[in-house]
Amino acid sequence: MDRFIRMLEDRVMPVAGKIAEQRHLQAIRDGIILSMPLLIIGSLFLIVGFLPIPGYNEWMAKWFGEHWLDKLLYPVGATFDIMALVVSFGVAYRLAEKYKVDALSAGAISLAAFLLATPYQVPFTPEGAKETIMVSGGIPVQWVGSKGLFVAMILAIVSTEIYRKIIQKNIVIKLPDGVPPAVARSFVALIPGAAVLVVVWVARLILEMTPFESFHNIVSVLLNKPLSVLGGSVFGAIVAVLLVQLLWSTGLHGAAIVGGVMGPIWLSLMDENRMVFQQNPNAELPNVITQQFFDLWIYIGGSGATLALALTMMFRARSRQLKSLGRLAIAPGIFNINEPITFGMPIVMNPLLIIPFILVPVVLVVVSYAAMATGLVAKPSGVAVPWTTPIVISGYLATGGKISGSILQIVNFFIAFAIYYPFFSIWDKQKAAEEQADPTISSGAGATHSL
């Protein structure tokens, strides 16, 4: 085990640290976070629209008219269906901030580049016709929503890189010092912005002469579909949680690092479920693996599913340190925040506790996937329930009001308890012995590894 810890320190930590500091991945992560408040707001309307109450639809139709649901879901389209637009602006804005250039201009240019790369065509089936035709001039909702995420992120990075290089080479229009700063910044962005749009425009013209026809089609074939297959599989989920837990074991924020790469895929899969659920709440949903799958069923109490460990320390610990830590950690743990345990127990770089910390999420992925894939438990409906929502409540809301989602969370809690308990008992015995040998040891969680 000591050799394993040294391997983590010598090989994993340096690589993971560089990935964590990679500015493009940080910009993608922060840009996606910008869209989350909108998705949560839209999800609230979804929840209200599909409350699992007998007679609810009839009662709402009586009071608000036959088309009450269509009107209620207007905000869903105004939040979920502009996801790519928000991410396009957000990624470029955050990346420009890291380069210390005008972020607002970079975001606006990225947004323009994304719209330039997007064909303004929508499918339409005339009355009585059997074939669908493409009509020009309409806003293509499918591409400005989750399906356009990859194009939005790629163009945000490319456009910002072009923008900042031209700025840094000082190929800009400079105005006299007396001009207001806002006006001066807008003129500084003229040449870089024009360069970005010309590049995207020429690329679009070239693609239109190929079988791919557009940026969205080529990215869908080369990136979106293969990554969605990988990210949406149980194998991909296991690899992802293994990486998350290994990184956390070295003290690095595993969820942020892995999420920067996989987050767009899981978010897109989540929205696929949302679109099906919105059309028919009782329909078979296409995906088990989504962002909510990890946030609400795997990381119960935070990465490593440590809520069970916090309760165990609170009620079963003989060590004063661990009992005090359990009392401290239980409140944030209920809201899936577990840094007090991860760094206070500690789990980080602890040869004994790293074992269950890595093992528990892997087991929960297998159990949860099997339960949902076989139909025993409802799949995530695409409702963006905040990751800080306590278990039972979150499982019920995230499955569109299915009690099976809450039951699976409870089952996962007890699975985590069963795996953690033997390792906790050994650690607790060691800490209690240390306290008995040295009564001056403080009641705070110790950091000495006894193995």
Curated annotation (Swiss-Prot):
<feature type="transmembrane region" description="Helical">
    <location>
        <begin position="227"/>
        <end position="247"/>
    </location>
</feature>
<feature type="transmembrane region" description="Helical">
    <location>
        <begin position="31"/>
        <end position="51"/>
    </location>
</feature>
<keyword id="KW-0598">Phosphotransferase system</keyword>
<dbReference type="GO" id="GO:0005886">
    <property type="term" value="C:plasma membrane"/>
</dbReference>
<dbReference type="InterPro" id="IPR004796">
    <property type="entry name" value="PTS_IIC_cello"/>
</dbReference>
<keyword id="KW-1003">Cell membrane</keyword>
<comment type="function">
    <text>The phosphoenolpyruvate-dependent sugar phosphotransferase system (sugar PTS), a major carbohydrate active transport system, catalyzes the phosphorylation of incoming sugar substrates concomitantly with their translocation across the cell membrane. The enzyme II CelABD PTS system is involved in cellobiose transport.</text>
</comment>
<dbReference type="GO" id="GO:0008982">
    <property type="term" value="F:protein-N(PI)-phosphohistidine-sugar phosphotransferase activity"/>
</dbReference>
<dbReference type="GO" id="GO:0009401">
    <property type="term" value="P:phosphoenolpyruvate-dependent sugar phosphotransferase system"/>
</dbReference>
<protein>
    <recommendedName>
        <fullName>PTS system cellobiose-specific EIIC component</fullName>
    </recommendedName>
</protein>
<feature type="transmembrane region" description="Helical">
    <location>
        <begin position="293"/>
        <end position="313"/>
    </location>
</feature>
<dbReference type="Pfam" id="PF02378">
    <property type="entry name" value="PTS_EIIC"/>
</dbReference>
<dbReference type="InterPro" id="IPR004501">
    <property type="entry name" value="PTS_EIIC_3"/>
</dbReference>
<keyword id="KW-1133">Transmembrane helix</keyword>
<keyword id="KW-0472">Membrane</keyword>
<dbReference type="GO" id="GO:1901264">
    <property type="term" value="P:carbohydrate derivative transport"/>
</dbReference>
<dbReference type="InterPro" id="IPR051088">
    <property type="entry name" value="PTS_Sugar-EIIC/EIIB"/>
</dbReference>
<feature type="domain" description="PTS EIIC type-3">
    <location>
        <begin position="8"/>
        <end position="423"/>
    </location>
</feature>
<feature type="transmembrane region" description="Helical">
    <location>
        <begin position="187"/>
        <end position="207"/>
    </location>
</feature>
<keyword id="KW-0762">Sugar transport</keyword>
<feature type="transmembrane region" description="Helical">
    <location>
        <begin position="407"/>
        <end position="427"/>
    </location>
</feature>
<feature type="transmembrane region" description="Helical">
    <location>
        <begin position="347"/>
        <end position="367"/>
    </location>
</feature>
<feature type="transmembrane region" description="Helical">
    <location>
        <begin position="104"/>
        <end position="124"/>
    </location>
</feature>
<dbReference type="InterPro" id="IPR003352">
    <property type="entry name" value="PTS_EIIC"/>
</dbReference>
<keyword id="KW-0812">Transmembrane</keyword>
<feature type="transmembrane region" description="Helical">
    <location>
        <begin position="250"/>
        <end position="270"/>
    </location>
</feature>
<feature type="transmembrane region" description="Helical">
    <location>
        <begin position="138"/>
        <end position="158"/>
    </location>
</feature>
<feature type="transmembrane region" description="Helical">
    <location>
        <begin position="72"/>
        <end position="92"/>
    </location>
</feature>
<keyword id="KW-0813">Transport</keyword>
